[in-house]
Regions:
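Feature captures the catalytic cores and cofactor-binding loops of soluble hydro-lyases/lyases
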Residues: 67, 72-232, 246-305
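Short, isolated positions in well-ordered beta-strands
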Residues: 60-61, 230
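Buried hydrophobic positions in well-ordered alpha/beta secondary-structure cores of metabolic enzymes
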Residues: 57, 174, 234-236
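Channel- or pocket-lining gating/hinge segments that regulate access to a cavity or pore
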Residues: 241-244
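C-terminal segment of classical bacterial N-terminal signal peptides
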Residues: 21-29
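Short acidic, Pro/Gly- and aromatic-enriched capping/linker segments at domain boundaries
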Residues: 33-55, 64-68
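Bacterial N-terminal signal peptides that target proteins for export
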Residues: 2-16, 25-26
C-alpha cells in the first residue's frame, strides 16, 4: 500500500469564504480560483487523509483498497451504520434511476457543482477558467480532467429538463477514461446506447434537451447530492439501495469491520444449523464456551478476535 506523508500539509492557504462555491478570500494567493480548490486547500479540508494525494490534491485511496471493496462485493447495508456511528450520518442518498443496477459502482469521487445560471457570476468564472488555460467552462472541461478510477459525481441540483450532463458519446469517453461509472443528480439521455456499455450510472431522469441555463460553480469542491455531502476523493459505493460516500480515512477500518461481521454472521448461521441454540444465545454476548468457539472460528478465517 502506497501511504506517504501529506506533501501539502504545510502549504495550507487560509480558508475560503464560501466552501460550497469555493470563493477565494482576499488573504489567499492569486492562484486560488473561484470554482476550484487548490491542492493546498484540498489538503486543508481533508486533514484526516492517511494516504498520498493525486496531483489535484484529492486523497488517493489506493487501488488495492478499491479492488478489495469490489472483490468483497461490499453492500451499503453493511457500511451505512458504521459511518453513522462514526459521526457521518449524511453520506447516503437513495431514490435513483440506475443503469446496470446489479453492478457495484466503486471509485474515487471527482465532484462537479452546477447552479442555475447567473450572468455576472458566470462571466467572472469564465474569465477565471480562461486564465487557467481551461478554455470555456462547461461540462467537457470537467470530463477532460477525469483520471482512471474516478467517479464523476455531478450536482446538477436534480435538474432533468435542460439538465442532461452527458449523452452516449461523452458517456463512452468517460467509461474509457475512468473504467468506473457516474453519479448525476440531474439528467441523462441516449440511455439505450449508454446501457450497452455496461457502465453503472445513477441519475434522476431523462430529457432530450441538452445542458443549458446552468453554470459550473465548483470543480472538486464539497457538494450536496440530495441529502448527502460528498467530498472530492471520497470512495463512492453504489448498489441497488443507492449511493454512499465514504471518507478516505475510514476506508480501511470499514473493510476490516465488514470482514469481521461477515465471519461473525457465518458463525451464527453455523450454530443455528446445529439446532442446539436459541437466537438469544447467539446474538448478543455468547457464553464463555460459545465465545471460545467463535474466537477459533474467526482465527480459522484469518480474523484476529
Amino acid at each position: 500500500m502506497n501511504i506517504q506523508p501529506n506533501k501539502w500539509a504545510k502549504k495550507v492557504v487560509p480558508g475560503i469564504a464560501c466552501l460550497v462555491l469555493a470563493f477565494a478570500s482576499q488573504t489567499q494567493t492569486v492562484n486560488a480560483q473561484v470554482n476550484h480548490l487548490t491542492p493546498e486547500e484540498m489538503a486543508h479540508y481533508t486533514p484526516n487523509n492517511p494516504f498520498d494525494r493525486l496531483n489535484d490534491g484529492r486523497p488517493r485511496v489506493p487501488d488495492a483498497l478499491l479492488d478489495t471493496i469490489r472483490n468483497m462485493d461490499m453492500a451499503i447495508v453493511e457500511v451505512y451504520a458504521l459511518l453513522r456511528d462514526k459521526g457521518f450520518p449524511n453520506q447516503f442518498e437513495g431514490d435513483w434511476k440506475v443503469l446496470q443496477p446489479g453492478k457495484r459502482l466503486v471509485g474515487r469521487a471527482f465532484t462537479v457543482q452546477f447552479m442555475p445560471t447567473r450572468a455576472d457570476l458566470n462571466d467572472v468564472m469564465q474569465q477565471d477558467a480562461a486564465a487557467k488555460g481551461w478554455g470555456r467552462l462547461r461540462n467537457q472541461t470537467t470530463i477532460d480532467m477525469l483520471e482512471s478510477g474516478d467517479v464523476a459525481v455531478v450536482d446538477l441540483y436534480g435538474k432533468v429538463e435542460e439538465g442532461t450532463f452527458v449523452g452516449d458519446k461523452l458517456a463512452y469517453y468517460i467509461q474509457q477514461k475512468t473504467g468506473t461509472g457516474m453519479v448525476i443528480d440531474g439528467g441523462l439521455f441516449f440511455v439505450e446506447a449508454i446501457e450497452k456499455t455496461g457502465m453503472p450510472i445513477y441519475y434522476r431522469g431523462t430529457h432530450p434537451e441538452s445542458l443549458r441555463n446552468s453554470m459550473i460553480t465548483g470543480i472538486n469542491v464539497p457538494i450536496r447530492v440530495g441529502g448527502a455531502t460528498a467530498m472530492p476523493g471520497d470512495v463512492v459505493l453504489g448498489d441497488q439501495d443507492g449511493l454512499l460516500f465514504i471518507p478516505p480515512h475510514l476506508v480501511e477500518e470499514i473493510i476490516d469491520a465488514v470482514k469481521r461481521k461477515r465471519v461473525r454472521d457465518a458463525w451464527s448461521k453455523k450454530q443455528f444449523d446445529t439446532g442446539k441454540y436459541k437466537s438469544s444465545e447467539i446474538y448478543g454476548r455468547p457464553s464463555p464456551e460459545l465465545q471460545k468457539d467463535l474466537d477459533q472460528f474467526m482465527r480459522d478465517h484469518g480474523i484476529t478476535p
